[in-house]
């Protein structure tokens, strides 16, 4: 499955999803994901101001995987085109491979390697600290037991990360 993941990663890196300038549309990377998630019910939503999300569901999953697709702006100090993934020995280089197109590629490869229930929310508004995609998703009130957010955390599970949170609490007494 590594080669399939790297193939998807190469494609995902080729899409310019820098944020700013928030020029992401419902095409491009979202067309690629839609085309590579066969068997999923896919919904692409434009939330305005360059914030786009793709919600994909197959079956009746208990968990949702969330991945943002936007990247930080590139730098003039890149030694090669940042939108062309390069393999260097045991690593790959390209804009967004770590944060976090690599996780998106792995999820797409895993989804294609099985026919199990799965749910994904791909968003494009994380880098600008304008959580339109997540806020709109939370407003839908979909009943997942947990959401797993893909972020580079040095392979450590974390229970909180910068961003927004949503809590539903009940008190008695």
Predicted regions and their residues:
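Acidic/histidine-rich catalytic neighborhood of metal-dependent amide-processing enzymes
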Residues: 96, 100-171
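N-terminal helical capping/dimerization or prosegment-like subdomains
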Residues: 1-75
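Short beta-strand-to-loop capping motifs
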Residues: 58, 171-173
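A generic structural signal for beta-strand entry/edge sites
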Residues: 51-53, 89-92, 164
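A short, structural micro-pattern
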Residues: 6, 79, 161-163
